[in-house]
UniProtKB/Swiss-Prot annotation:
Residues that coordinate or bind ATP: L21, R22, G63, K66, T67, T68, E129, D130, Y131, R172, Y182, R219
GO term, biological process aspect, one: DNA repair
Function as written in the Swiss-Prot or TrEMBL entry: The RuvA-RuvB-RuvC complex processes Holliday junction (HJ) DNA during genetic recombination and DNA repair, while the RuvA-RuvB complex plays an important role in the rescue of blocked DNA replication forks via replication fork reversal (RFR). RuvA specifically binds to HJ cruciform DNA, conferring on it an open structure. The RuvB hexamer acts as an ATP-dependent pump, pulling dsDNA into and through the RuvAB complex. RuvB forms 2 homohexamers on either side of HJ DNA bound by 1 or 2 RuvA tetramers; 4 subunits per hexamer contact DNA at a time.
One Pfam family linked to the record: RuvB_N
Entry keyword set: ATP-binding, Cytoplasm, DNA damage, DNA recombination, DNA repair, DNA-binding, Hydrolase, Nucleotide-binding
Organism for this UniProt entry: Anaplasma marginale (strain St. Maries)
UniProt-recorded name of the protein: Holliday junction branch migration complex subunit RuvB
InterPro entries according to UniProt: AAA+_ATPase, AAA_lid_4, DNA_helicase_Holl-junc_RuvB, P-loop_NTPase, RuvB-like_N, RuvB_C, WH-like_DNA-bd_sf, WH_DNA-bd_sf
C-alpha cells in the first residue's frame, strides 16, 4: 500500500479487520460526546416505549464512526441490523424488496445515502412516514397504485455529503446527527483500546505520536496503529510501541509530523504554486484525482485545520499553510 492511499477514507481491503476493534455498546464508544449523550436518550426512550426509534441521519467526514454507531443503535435496541448502500440500489424494486423483508422494529442502514437516485428516494418517503410502499402497477391508462404495508422500522442513513441530500428526504429524518473530527486525546483512547483488544503493548507517548498524525479520524488512527505494529513485530518481535518507535515507523510510511501524506503535500504545493485562488477542477486535473475524492478525503481536514481556505473564486493557501510548507522545507 502506498503512502498516498494510506490515509484515504474509502473502505480498503483491510478495513474489515477493524470490525473486531469496533465498540459494540454505546458505553464503549469513544468521542462524539454530545452525539452520544443525545443518542442514549433517544435509544432508551424508544426501547421503553417498545416503538421503533425515529429515523437517524449520521453525517460528517469519512471514518468518524457512522457505521459503528448504526450497529450500536441496533444492538442497544435489541433488534436486527440490515444494511445496504446507496450505489447498490439501482431501481425502486431493489429497495422495495429490502423493505418488505424487514421484521418489525428492525434497523435498516443505508450508507452513502446521498447517492440514491430520486426515484428510489420517492419510495422511501411513504416508507419512512407511513410504513407503506406505493407501487405503480401497469402502464399508461391501465396503471394503478398498490399500497403495501411494511413493518415499522428505523432507517439510519449515513453520508459524507450532507448538502447532496434532497430537502424532502433530509426533512424526514427526525434525528440528524453531525459527527466531528476527534481530538488527539480521544484518538489516544481509541488506539489504546485497540491495542488492548489485539494484545499489543503501547505506551502513552506511542499512542499520542500515532494519534497526532491521524487527521482527527479513528479509521486512520487504527490503520496507522496496525502498520506501526507490523514494524514492531518485524523488527523486535516483542516489546512496546513508544513515541520514538512510532515516529520512526510513521516516517518510513511517509506520514509527516502534521499527518500529511504525499497526496496532501502535492495538493498544498500545487495551491501554493498557483499564486492565487485555484478551482477544484484544476486541482483534480493536476493531481489526477477525482473531484469528489478530493472534496471528501483531502480537503475537509485541511480546511478544518486552516491550512487552506475555500473562496468563491477557488482554493487558497492560508498563512498557516504557507508557514508550514516553508518551515518543513517543502518549498
Amino acid at each position: 500500500m502506498s503512502s498516498d492511499t494510506l490515509h484515504k477514507y474509502e473502505a480498503l481491503p483491510e478495513d474489515h479487520r477493524n470490525v473486531a476493534l469496533r465498540p459494540c455498546l454505546i458505553e464503549e464508544f469513544v468521542g462524539q460526546t454530545e452525539v452520544i449523550k443525545n443518542l442514549k436518550v433517544f435509544i432508551q426512550s424508544a426501547y421503553e416505549r417498545r416503538e421503533p426509534m425515529d429515523h437517524v441521519l449520521l453525517y460528517g467526514p469519512p471514518g468518524l464512526g457512522k457505521t459503528t454507531l448504526a450497529h450500536i443503535i441496533a444492538k442497544e435496541l435489541k433488534v436486527n441490523f440490515r444494511s445496504t448502500a446507496g450505489p447498490l440500489l439501482s431501481k425502486a424494486g431493489d429497495l422495495a424488496a429490502i423493505l418488505t423483508n424487514l421484521q418489525p422494529m428492525d434497523v435498516l442502514f443505508i450508507d452513502e445515502i446521498h447517492r440514491l437516485n430520486r426515484n428510489i428516494e420517492e419510495v422511501l418517503y411513504s416508507a419512512m412516514e407511513d410504513y407503506c410502499l406505493d407501487i405503480v402497477v401497469g402502464e399508461g391508462c391501465g396503471a394503478r397504485t398498490l399500497k403495501i404495508d411494511i413493518p415499522a422500522f428505523t432507517l439510519i442513513g449515513a453520508t459524507t455529503r450532507f448538502g447532496l441530500i434532497s430537502n424532502p428526504l433530509r426533512d424526514r429524518f427526525g434525528i440528524p446527527l453531525h459527527l466531528e473530527f476527534y481530538s488527539v486525546d480521544e484518538l489516544v483512547l481509541v488506539i489504546k483500546r485497540a491495542a488492548g483488544v489485539i494484545c499489543t503493548s503501547i505506551d502513552d507517548s506511542g499512542a499520542r505520536e500515532i494519534a497526532s498524525r491521524s487527521r482527527g479520524t479513528p479509521r486512520i488512527a487504527l490503520r496507522l496503529f496496525r502498520r506501526v505494529r507490523d514494524f514492531l513485530e518485524f523488527e523486535r518481535k516483542h516489546g512496546t510501541i513508544d513515541g520514538n518507535f512510532a515516529n520512526s515507523a510513521l516516517f518510513r510510511l511517509g506520514i509527516d509530523g502534521a499527518g500529511f501524506d504525499k497526496m496532501d503535500l502535492k495538493y498544498l504545493k500545487f495551491v501554493f504554486e498557483a499564486k492565487g485562488p485555484v478551482g477544484i477542477d484544476t486541482i483534480a486535473s493536476a493531481l489526477s484525482e477525482d473531484v469528489g475524492n478530493i472534496e471528501e478525503t483531502i480537503e475537509p481536514y485541511l480546511i478544518k485545520t486552516c491550512f487552506i481556505q475555500r473562496t468563491p473564486r477557488g482554493r487558497v493557501l492560508t498563512q498557516k499553510g504557507f508557514e508550514y510548507l516553508l518551515s518543513s522545507k517543502y518549498i
